[in-house]
Structure formats: C-alpha cells, structure tokens
C-alpha cells in the first residue's frame, strides 16, 4: 500500500523521560542539570550557557534549544506540582487519559506500560 492513508497511527509524548542515567546531565559542562532524589531531572536556565551539549547528547530530543533565549529548555515534570501532590500539566491535559506518572521500580506496574514503544530509541544504559 501507499504511505497514505495510514491504517494505523501512534502518538508518543516526547517530553523528557527523566532517565535514571541522563545523558543531558553528563553532557552539561556547567551543571545546569540536576537529578532530584525522586528522579526528576531539572534544568536551571540561570546556569545554562547555551552550548547545546544536552540537545546533541539526549537520544530522545528532550532538551530543546530556544533561539530567543539562547538557552536550552526541557520538561520539568512540573515538579512544583508533584511536590504538593498534584499531577503534571500534561497528565491533566491529556484528553484521553493516556498519560500518567508511573514508578517503574514499583512492585506492580500496569500491564499496558511500554518502556520502549516501536520507533523509540532503545537506550537501556540511560534507563528512561
């Protein structure tokens, strides 16, 4: 068949995966990234020098370079909301309830959780 019309489509959130061993943290020469105890990887734009090392090294394309500010930016997992027991904005905004925050180290993980969906870079050393 031709490429169009698609018989099946899949949509993936390509926000930050907050990897266990994040490439962005390792690549940043000024430590603009920190990893919290809860696993959230936070970017500090005040420290960022705009070198783009994080954007080049993240296989998932999570950090993006903002041409206007000349600095990297990425999903913060809305850690301020998580700290007060709320969900991140993306979870609340998803119209079909497809997004959720899941602890992959928990004893029970829902059956429908897929860590490496088709087409997603397989990088077990980062443990997204």
Residue ranges and their predicted role:
Residues 1-128:
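Non-ligating segments of multi-cofactor redox enzymes
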């Amino acid at each position: 068949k031709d490429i169009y019309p698609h018989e099946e489509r899949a949509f993936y959130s390509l926000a930050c995966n907050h990897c266990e061993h994040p490439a962005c943290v390792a690549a940043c020469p000024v430590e603009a990234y920190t990893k919290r105890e809860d696993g959230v990887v936070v970017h500090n734009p005040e420290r960022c020098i705009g070198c783009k090392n994080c954007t080049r090294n993240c296989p998932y394309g999570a950090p993006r370079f903002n041409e206007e500010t000349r600095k990297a930016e990425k999903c913060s997992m809305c850690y301020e909301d998580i700290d007060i027991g709320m969900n991140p904005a993306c979870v609340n905004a998803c119209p079909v309830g497809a997004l959720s925050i899941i602890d992959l180290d928990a004893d029970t993980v829902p059956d429908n959780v897929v860590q490496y969906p088709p087409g997603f870079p397989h990088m077990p050393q980062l443990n997204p």
